[in-house]
Amino acid sequence: MTRIIAGAAGSLSLAVPRSGTRPTSDRVREAIFSALEARDAIDGSVVLDLYAGSGALGLESASRGAVEVVLVERAKPAADVCRRNADAVTRAIGRGAARIRVVVKPVAAYLETAPAGVDLAFIDPPYDLDEAAVARDLALLAPLLNAEALVVVERSARSPEPAWPSGIELERRRDYGETTLWWATTADPAADEPAADALAAAEPAADEPVA
């Protein structure tokens, strides 16, 4: 089991698929969401959780004020877990809960026909997914992003930097043991220095424990 860390559904336990997924650790999720909260990137946002697994990243966003969350997961058993978790989060939040959808499709197939207007996207594929597939996903995602949208890519620390398409620019990299987070944005980095500073201040160092 894992849990929602904070927000309207804080402390709610989430189911995880029995196999075939690699849930983001609580430590890494806390680091991600501390940084996102510091730059006010969640409240009122439209969120994509690609390779959703249990849906923990998207559902954490819903708990913290996102208005729409799409969980994309091709494996039906994992998608069924996403639905159960989404129902539990919706009940816990109650009135004003985000609109949460679960899409049972390969990520690329979803992105090819998805609507634009995304504020925040999580890409957390299996570590053994090849780099060409990650690059394809990013290229399909780019035209769907709003101005100053954020993209968080979780990969193995042994994986190379993703190939960023036109329209998405690397902001920073953070390492947490065997996990690397790549933060990227559609904004001009020179114009977004205060936000980048907030991210650096809020995010724990790679060797710093998260409370």
Predicted regions, residues:
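Class I S-adenosyl-L-methionine-dependent methyltransferase catalytic core
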Residues: 1-211
